[in-house]
Amino acid sequence: MALGAGHAHACRDDGDDSVIDAPPPYESVAGASAGQFVVIDIDTPTDSPPPYSAGTSPVGLVSPASSGDGEVCERGRSRRAAWRAARRARRRAERRARRRSFGPGGLFVETPLFLPETMIGAHPGVGGDLPSGLPTYAEATSDRPPTYAMVMAACPTEPPGGSVGPADQPRVQSSRTWRPPLVNSRELYRAQRAARCASSSDTPQAPGWCGGTCRHAVFGVVAVVVVIILAFLWR
């Protein structure tokens, strides 16, 4: 305000004929908030919605302004839709029951399969050849292998034919099987040399006879040579 008033006075002092008025006074926020506000009503419902019902359909909702014939038609449509939904649900339940009633291999089972913490049971008269050591539902979901006792109980000990052929009989092996003796190469050489010496002479000799005779003969020859050399040197 002071700036605008000063500017007006300056213009008057300059001698200008046009008079410039001061700007309007500033209105604070408090003054603006005291005014009237426009409220827009968009017809927002404040009541809670009706409870959900599986038998009703959005098609069945009829405005009160509709005629009586239209109301009857809408009610008939909603009833037919509810009947169709009920028939579909019944058929789905029957299909699930049929799927549960057939066990592994297509055999009919009265009790439902894959019950938690229960063994898979079959009718006593149907599927009697099924293995009895099947794991439970919890063991199957946790992916734990069956124990050795369960596997042995499930596997049949005898073939279905009852008779075992000669080719199927297990070979009876004694615990004392023949094995070649562990012989040292030196001992083998001595045995072979003794066998050669024994085969060359008619009289049976001891195993060490061939070696001792050869040594004595060599010593005798050496002694004779030494004696001859000493005799020549003595003369």
From Swiss-Prot:
Belongs to the herpesviridae UL56 family. Keywords: Host cytoplasm, Host Golgi apparatus, Host membrane, Membrane, Transmembrane, Transmembrane helix. This is Protein UL56. It comes from the Viruses. Interacts with host ITCH; this interaction induces ubiquitination and degradation of ITCH. Interacts with host NEDD4; this interaction increases NEDD4 ubiquitination. Interacts with UL11. One of its GO terms (cellular component) is membrane. Pfam families: Herpes_UL56 (PF04534). Late-budding domains (L domains) are short sequence motifs essential for viral particle budding. They recruit proteins of the host ESCRT machinery (Endosomal Sorting Complex Required for Transport) or ESCRT-associated proteins. UL56 contains three L domains: the PPXY motifs which are involved in the interaction with ITCH, a member of the NEDD4 family. The chain crosses the membrane at residues 214-234. A motif (PPXY motif) lies at residues 23-26, 49-52, 144-147. Plays a role in the transport and release of virions form the host cytoplasm to the extracellular space. Relocalizes host NEDD4, a cytosolic E3 ligase, to cytoplasmic vesicles. Residues 1-27, 45-74 are annotated as: Disordered. It is found in: Host Golgi apparatus membrane; Host cytoplasm. It is a single-pass membrane protein.
